[in-house]
């Protein structure tokens, strides 16, 4: 494809993204020093290549998924997005990893007015410290602190009432012998270590291990923010079937998890266009993702879900810098 055809395709897609109306040769002739007849010939070539097509109700042309793919891969000029540093520091807190992840999803949604998603880090089930607190007769609160500083609570049903001194003894034993290990590793070595303790304390410790392992597996793998903003996107909200598919994607999350998992193994920003990528189940939807990590190690992925007709040159740098900001926030928490 020659430079003239590439320039016309770029202009057509940019115009369509801007106003959502099929683009005709007369419109493009105002941009290029070419006759409408010449432009129609070029558009016919682009249509033959599968890059644009004509809706039934219009003589103009709109981009196909393949056209969008060529646009984002080789025609798009992306500039760095400018943030106010102080403002971002407030939006991505470093005090708690879970807060930073939720804030990143909200930031993506607020800046793009689409849905922001974050694939949360896979839990390693490692704990730094645990504590037992007596709640009432035969009820004990288990407090688990992860190496990242996250705090998780579980209520244990005990077989008898424990004194505060006994619970302190059990917690100290656990922290001295098992801190820095996973609950699965603790489970494997528990029998020999617990021989040093009374039988009733051993049962409490075993209950703590099971609750800790369960806590590590709990929680949403995907954090989603702003999905309702897609109700304001005409390309999606104007069709009830599209809306049902969209919210089914958010509800079931299987396809979304697969896409985010695949993108976490890729380098840098990835753009998945519906109709072009099998990972996106809807032709009217695009997903832009970027991996984030701690100290150079990728631990998750985040992104934006929006219409295929989106301002890619604006959304791409937002996703990129949010991934960098989240990585920075999580690294500072170590």
Swiss-Prot record:
Keyword flag Transcription: yes
Gene3D superfamilies the record matches: 3.30.450.40, Heat-inducible transcription repressor hrca homolog, domain 3, Winged helix-like DNA-binding domain superfamily/Winged helix DNA-binding domain
InterPro entries (alphabetical): GAF-like_dom_sf (IPR029016), HrcA (IPR002571), HrcA_C (IPR021153), WH-like_DNA-bd_sf (IPR036388), WH_DNA-bd_sf (IPR036390), WHTH_HrcA_DNA-bd (IPR005104), WHTH_transcript_rep_HrcA_IDD (IPR023120)
Signal peptide range: none
GO molecular function, one term: DNA binding
Function: Negative regulator of class I heat shock genes (grpE-dnaK-dnaJ and groELS operons). Prevents heat-shock induction of these operons.
HAMAP family in the cross-refs: HrcA
PANTHER family per the UniProt record, alphabetical: HEAT-INDUCIBLE TRANSCRIPTION REPRESSOR HRCA
Name of the protein: Heat-inducible transcription repressor HrcA
Organism (species): Bordetella pertussis (strain Tohama I / ATCC BAA-589 / NCTC 13251)
Native organism taxonomy: Bacteria, Pseudomonadati, Pseudomonadota, Betaproteobacteria, Burkholderiales
